[in-house]
Amino acid sequence: MARCRRHSRSRSRSRNQCQRRRRRHYNRRRTYRRSRRHSRRRRVRRRGCSCRRCSRRRRRRC
């Protein structure tokens, strides 16, 4: 009987770990996607001008 009880306990623990792992992975993916967007925006700003004329010609200087 003791063995049975121990087995059920370990089973539930492993299930919880799996859920935690999955949740952590999802959060990591989400943050990575968000950071990528921000970095792209910053690059555009660093280049220089962002007015309509320059954006149409694909030139970042005014």
From Swiss-Prot:
GO terms for cellular component: nucleosome; nucleus. Its main location: nucleus. Keywords: Chromosome, Developmental protein, Differentiation, DNA condensation, DNA-binding, Nucleosome core, Nucleus, Spermatogenesis. It is found in: Nucleus; Chromosome. Disulfide bonds: none annotated. One of its GO terms (molecular function) is DNA binding. Residues 1-46 are annotated as: Disordered. Testis. GO terms for biological process: cell differentiation; chromosome condensation; spermatogenesis. Belongs to the protamine P1 family. Protamines substitute for histones in the chromatin of sperm during the haploid phase of spermatogenesis. They compact sperm DNA into a highly condensed, stable and inactive complex. This is Sperm protamine P1. It comes from Planigale gilesi. The lineage of its organism: Eukaryota, Metazoa, Chordata, Craniata, Vertebrata. The gene is PRM1.
